[in-house]
UniProtKB/Swiss-Prot annotation:
Gene source species: Cupriavidus pinatubonensis (strain JMP 134 / LMG 1197)
UniProtKB keywords: Dioxygenase, Iron, Metal-binding, Oxidoreductase, Vitamin C
Fe2OG dioxygenase domain: residues covered: 80-180
One Pfam assignment: PKHD_C
Gene Ontology biological process terms, A to Z: DNA damage response; intracellular iron ion homeostasis
GO molecular function list: 2-oxoglutarate-dependent dioxygenase activity; iron ion binding; L-ascorbic acid binding
Protein name (database record): PKHD-type hydroxylase Reut_A2877
Length: 228
């Protein structure tokens, strides 16, 4: 399930993050330092040292906004969110086809995190660069994603994906992973559809007893499938 989440950050917040990243100096490092053995040969970008002060400051802002975003909560059903990381692609940079590693070590507390969901939060205006599309492969084909600054996409971390070469400008983004309460993507998709249907029924004033029954079914499925 690939889900677009608009306006995770507003224009002012995007500007604040971008300003901090643009003045990060030596905190920008070769992106291959965190790549696995299969990703390193095809990864050509820069990223912020995830333990740097600028990373910690930007992480707090993004995590705070995610906690208050109903669409993110509904789609991801997050259990643990890996602290957001930040990358930069200039002209000629790319990240070839790869699958994200299955387990990450939390940089702040050492916990192991299962990467159920991958997330990319775009921080550059979509018309400020050419190329740089996030391409995600699933059973229905290839999906090309290029969103405006402040918008985010989440998709199964099991997906083969890539970032196409930059031919003009610079693409800055945040990326991270989520260990969901529901590890199975099909089950998450079903619960996401149910939650959306419930919200629409609430807006239309549909039969209250029927809505309560549907809400009960949602929570009973969540109770049956979730891992905490």
């Amino acid at each position: 399930m690939l889900v677009v989440i608009p306006q995770v950050l507003n224009a002012e917040q995007v500007g604040a993050v971008r300003e901090r990243l643009e003045h990060a100096g030596e905190a920008w490092v070769d992106g291959r330092v965190t790549a696995g053995y299969s990703g390193a040969p095809v990864k050509f970008n820069q990223q912020i040292d995830e333990r740097s002060d600028v990373a910690l400051e930007c992480q707090r802002l993004i995590l705070g906004m995610l906690e208050r975003n109903p669409r993110f909560i509904s789609a991801a059903l997050p259990n643990i969110v890996y602290p957001p990381m930040f990358n930069r692609y200039s002209e000629g940079m790319t990240f070839g086809a790869h699958v994200d590693g299955s387990v990450r070590i939390h940089p702040h507390d050492g916990r192991k995190l299962r990467t159920d969901i991958s997330a990319t939060l775009f921080l550059s205006p979509h018309d400020s660069y050419d190329g740089g599309e996030l391409q995600v492969q699933d059973t229905y084909g290839m999906h090309s994603v290029k969103l405006d600054a402040g918008d985010m996409v989440v998709y199964p971390a099991t997906s083969l994906h890539q970032v196409t070469p930059i031919t003009r400008g610079t693409r800055v983004a945040s990326f991270f992973w989520i260990q969901s309460l529901i590890r199975d993507d099909t089950q998450r998709s079903l619960l996401f559809d149910m939650d959306n249907a419930i919200q629409r029924l609430n807006q239309t004033g549909a039969d209250e007893e029927a809505r309560r029954t549907l809400v009960g079914c949602y929570h009973n499925l969540l109770r049956q499938w979730s891992e905490t």
